[in-house]
């Protein structure tokens, strides 16, 4: 039994430290212009958050993500839209309306989502300049951001920007 637990722990730890792509690229959801975010160019690190144009949970986190971007200006933020069941017109209209202060990249074939093994929204990652995943998890503890009791992404960013090891990975 101990061996099984050790194996599971090592597997999860390895995946957290695994290399990720050197960049994310695709077209903007709002104007279709090409976008390319290279992690090594970030001042501190890059937050990647997978969002949906139709998910109420994702939508409830938009104001909170705007606040986080304002709170952590030296951190690069980028959103990825990978939901293939959401048409381009709906997606474009939604992301224009919410007006995020960072790029939203359309991931038409879900290649970015596959590379990060992202399968829900909102889901976030912090990627270091060395292309290592420092944090993977929810943005908050609730499907509705305003009802959250824990703010996972914010705590991870506080740990990172204050030179501490990220407690929650």
Regions found by a protein language model. Name each.
Residues 3-12:
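Sec-dependent N-terminal signal peptides
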Residues 15-18:
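Boundary at the C-terminal end of the N-terminal hydrophobic targeting segment
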Residues 59-98, 106-115:
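Structural microenvironment flanking redox-active thiols in thiol-disulfide oxidoreductases
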Residues 38-59, 65, 157:
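Short active-site neighborhood of thiol/selenol oxidoreductases, capturing the structured segment around
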Residues 24-46:
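A short beta-strand-turn-helix
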Residues 128-169:
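Thiol-/selenol-based redox modules, centered on thioredoxin-like
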Residues 95-128, 133-136:
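Short, internal strand/loop/helix patches
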Residues 43-46, 73-76, 100-102, 129-130:
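Loop/turn elements at helix/coil->beta-strand transitions in domains of secreted/extracellular proteins
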């Amino acid at each position: 039994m101990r061996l099984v637990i050790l194996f599971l722990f090592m597997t999860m730890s390895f995946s957290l430290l695994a290399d990720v792509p050197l960049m994310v690229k695709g077209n903007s959801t709002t104007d279709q212009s090409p976008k390319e975010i290279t992690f090594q160019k970030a001042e501190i690190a890059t937050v990647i958050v997978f969002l949906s144009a139709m998910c109420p949970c994702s939508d409830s986190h938009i104001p909170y993500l705007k606040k986080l971007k304002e709170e952590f200006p030296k951190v690069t933020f980028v959103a990825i839209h990978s939901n293939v069941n959401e048409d381009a017109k709906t997606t474009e209209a939604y992301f224009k309306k919410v007006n995020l202060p960072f790029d939203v990249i359309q991931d038409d074939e879900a290649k970015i989502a596959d590379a990060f093994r992202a399968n829900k929204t909102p889901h976030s990652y912090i990627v270091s300049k060395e292309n290592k995943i420092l944090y993977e998890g929810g943005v908050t503890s609730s499907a509705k951001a305003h009802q959250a009791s824990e703010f996972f992404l914010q705590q991870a960013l506080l740990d990172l920007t204050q030179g501490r090891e990220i407690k929650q990975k």
